[in-house]
């Protein structure tokens, strides 16, 4: 069974309403047959799960979908089992993966999506779709059991990617931090996914959506820039992906 994923860099662009830039793509991706959506708000920290879920619920209602937030149901495992789509919101990646491990939902979600159920994630929700969360930008505010993610794609994502250099700032750039990761993880690609872009994965095809380019990093290689019309299918070339 093939996987279907829509992995967003971010939820909101400057000057826009929440998830505005992604709404039509989300609707196109889910289609008209999806009715039961499971939403996971575990990345929320400064906001309550309830407040966060209602914010996301409004967006999905506006485009014709209802969903159940996982913290409100009696059995989170049953919710995932019966879901027709899984949506994982952004926030703090370490808190998100901690809660997914703690609730023992990682295997449930992985199995569900591996059997064809659509998965949508933004920011932290895209991070956890990767083999690990090691390319997150977030502060490790909590120690998870493991950095292992859902392993739904065979590459890493760095959401909110920017190659901007802050004047008079001597800290590491994003690219330098990713280079550190690659030294210790030389066999995996990292996709620098700028805000306002997303990756749509269906079967053995992957497509960049948005009006910006992405950057691809691999140990020992020059970073490569890819445009929305470029073929990225090679990123999915892993025997165990499907």
UniProtKB/Swiss-Prot annotation:
It is an enzyme of class 3 (hydrolase). It is found in: Cytoplasm. It catalyses: Dipeptidase E catalyzes the hydrolysis of dipeptides Asp-|-Xaa. It does not act on peptides with N-terminal Glu, Asn or Gln, nor does it cleave isoaspartyl peptides. Its EC number is 3.4.13.21. The active site is at residues 123, 138, 160. Coiled coil: none annotated. It holds the Pfam family Peptidase_S51. GO terms for molecular function: dipeptidase activity; serine-type peptidase activity. InterPro entries: Class_I_gatase-like, Peptidase_S51, Peptidase_S51_dipeptidase-E. PANTHER family: ALPHA-ASPARTYL DIPEPTIDASE, PROTEASE S51 ALPHA-ASPARTYL DIPEPTIDASE. Hydrolyzes dipeptides containing N-terminal aspartate residues. May play a role in allowing the cell to use peptide aspartate to spare carbon otherwise required for the synthesis of the aspartate family of amino acids. This is Peptidase E. The lineage of its organism: Bacteria, Bacillati, Cyanobacteriota, Cyanophyceae, Nostocales. The gene is pepE.
């Amino acid at each position: 069974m093939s996987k279907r994923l829509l992995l967003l860099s971010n939820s909101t662009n400057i000057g826009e309403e929440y998830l505005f830039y992604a709404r039509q793509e989300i609707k196109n991706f889910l289609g008209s047959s999806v009715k039961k959506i499971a939403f996971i708000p575990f990345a929320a920290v400064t906001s309550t799960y309830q407040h966060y879920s209602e914010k996301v619920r409004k967006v999905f209602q506006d485009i014709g979908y209802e969903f159940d937030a996982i913290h409100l149901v009696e059995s989170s495992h049953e919710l995932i089992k019966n879901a027709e789509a899984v949506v994982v919101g952004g926030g703090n990646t370490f808190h998100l993966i901690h809660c997914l491990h703690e609730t023992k939902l990682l295997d449930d979600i992985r199995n569900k999506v591996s059997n064809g159920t659509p998965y949508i994630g933004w920011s932290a929700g895209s991070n956890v779709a990767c083999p690990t969360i090691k390319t997150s930008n977030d502060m490790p505010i909590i120690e998870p059991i493991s950095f292992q993610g859902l392993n739904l794609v065979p590459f890493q994502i760095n959401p909110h990617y920017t190659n901007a250099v802050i004047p008079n700032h001597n800290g590491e750039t994003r690219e330098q931090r990713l280079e550190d990761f690659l030294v210790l993880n030389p066999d995996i690609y990292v996709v620098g996914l700028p805000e306002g872009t997303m990756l749509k994965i269906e079967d053995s095809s992957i497509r960049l959506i948005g009006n910006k380019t992405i950057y691809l990093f691999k140990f020992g290689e020059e970073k490569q820039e890819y445009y929305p019309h470029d073929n990225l299918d090679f990123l999915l070339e892993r025997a165990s992906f499907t």
